């Protein structure tokens, strides 16, 4: 929580500095910085709307095709198409009609569609079964490729492909 709060600039460090891509984040405009950020927490949040709109929330001007491509890229498309109304399936606030893994896949699709420069994943696979974890892992691989990513995890499988690993 402390690391996420510092990286997200909910507060600044009392000593030292935090560099992202070699730049001290204290001197970056807060709105600009946060608009380039995607944060995925252990407890995903879905809005009371359709799956299509929940993914589109990542980038409001996205076309249906772009939303579907994002879902395909993180392995969410298959389960979405098995739902009674596909992408038009209504989900309750917090996504209670979906499993934890399905909610996380929808959130990954949203994050991929938003295309943030900086990604923070906090225990993104902690509450899911092994089979769903494999799907989510593939989604994570696509999500972190080519961007600065901070992955906070207890499972080695979640961080095995990271360039640098810090153990705290």
Question: What would you call each of these model-derived segments?
Answer:
Residues 12:
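Post-Walker A helix-loop "phosphate-sensing" segment adjacent to the P-loop in P-loop NTPases
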Residues 16-23, 33:
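Conserved ABC transporter NBD signature motif
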Residues 2-8, 35-43, 51-54, 70-76, ...:
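ABC-family ATPase nucleotide-binding domain "signature/switch" substructure
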Residues 56-64, 78, 114:
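ABC-type ATPase nucleotide-binding domains, specifically the catalytic core motifs of the NBD
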């Amino acid at each position: 929580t402390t690391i996420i709060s510092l990286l997200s600039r909910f507060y600044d460090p009392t000593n030292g500095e935090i560099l992202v891509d070699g730049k001290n984040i204290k001197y970056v405009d807060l709105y600009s910085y946060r608009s380039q950020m995607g944060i995925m927490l252990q407890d995903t949040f879905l809005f009371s709307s359709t799956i299509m709109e929940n993914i589109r929330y990542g980038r409001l001007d996205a076309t249906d095709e772009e939303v579907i491509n994002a879902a395909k890229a993180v392995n969410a498309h298959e389960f979405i198409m098995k739902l009674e109304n596909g992408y038009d399936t209504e989900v309750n606030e917090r996504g209670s009609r979906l499993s934890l893994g399905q909610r996380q896949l929808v959130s990954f699709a949203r994050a991929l569609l938003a295309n943030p420069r900086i990604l923070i994943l906090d225990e993104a696979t902690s509450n899911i079964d092994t089979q769903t974890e494999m799907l989510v892992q593939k989604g994570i691989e696509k999500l972190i490729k080519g961007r600065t990513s901070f992955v906070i995890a207890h499972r080695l499988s979640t961080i095995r492909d990271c360039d640098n690993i810090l153990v705290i």
